[in-house]
Amino acid sequence: MTTICDLPRDLVARILSRVPLTSMRRVRFTCKRWNTISKDPSFAKTHFGKAARQFIMMSQSRVSLMSVKLHGDGNEDELADPYIYEGYRLDVYALGYDKNLKNHKILRFVDSYEPAVKHSIIEHEIFDLKSNAWRVLDATPDWEIDSYQRGVSLKGNTYFFAKEKIVVEGDDVVVIEDFKDFLICFDFTSERFNLDHVCLYRFTLTMERPVREEQLAVLYQQDTCLMEIWVTNKIEPDVVSWSKVFLAVDMEPLTGSFIPFAFFAGSFFIDEEKKIAVVFDKDQEEINDRAYLIGENGYYKEVDLGYMNGYYQQQVDPRGPDPVFPLVCSYSPSLVTIPQGTRGKRKERDY
């Protein structure tokens, strides 16, 4: 008698590719053959290719797990946030991996303003998961990272945009017209920063890591509504090169506004196959979170994600706090369980 485990391998693979990742554990216990198929690298690639892309969106204290399906016709694109969690605002951290010691580490930025010297003092700390302890990193960079610049983890390291550090003595006011951004990489193996000497003129620069590729994508704007997205074709801690522009769009005819995306917002992701970028920002009144779907040949769509605390525009108190812009990060589902350990001890200090 033929059973389901006797079906042709290709047919089984097509069937299993439609199973949600969170249910794959049950698949592996069905029979040895299914377990073997589910662990095959080619199956894993196909499975992730069919799955809806998932992202974590944080807006103030609300954290949402969002699934995204892009069809490219403007009518069937879907953004959904089925899981809502309440959390707290987070400090600036970066997670990486030491390839020599085979150990995960956490980089922490301590940025405090000192009135006596009238500029920020930046310290860096490393948390080693094996030793379960914090220690101060000996680094005196001649650059600084704006608080709204978000790092992106890739190949065990983390990349940031930084700018030249300007130290102002006394009460002088310095106006700098041609600030440039530098791409820097923190190498968790050597525990040092590597600087990419290719400068990028500043205005809006945000990064994204395509979920299925070992690349970085950069959203770039100047003081116009021309938006460009660049993608790397080679990236290592000490070497970065860029491919041609992935997408270049004049946003003014699409939005009817000359105002570009906010320089401290602009979380985004791209779909390289459909040539679509999805940028997360506020609406023009800076009240509701909004997703902007942008593509070639005038493709444009806005999706209202609602007010940051669950209420909509008509319920907003105009005297309330300043708007908090949504932050979206790539998310890859995994069956790996995170081990629970005791909290690491770190020296207390006043900030």
UniProtKB/Swiss-Prot annotation:
Pfam families per UniProt: F-box (PF00646), FBA_1 (PF07734)
Gene3D superfamilies, A to Z: 1.20.1280.50
SUPFAM superfamilies: F-box domain
PROSITE patterns per UniProt: FBOX
InterPro entries recorded: F-box-assoc_dom_typ1, F-box-assoc_interact_dom, F-box-like_dom_sf, F-box_dom
Sequence ranges assigned to domain F-box in this UniProt record: 1-51
PANTHER family for the chain: BNAA05G37150D PROTEIN-RELATED, F-BOX ASSOCIATED DOMAIN-CONTAINING PROTEIN
Protein name: Putative F-box protein At4g09790
Lineage of origin: Eukaryota, Viridiplantae, Streptophyta, Embryophyta, Tracheophyta
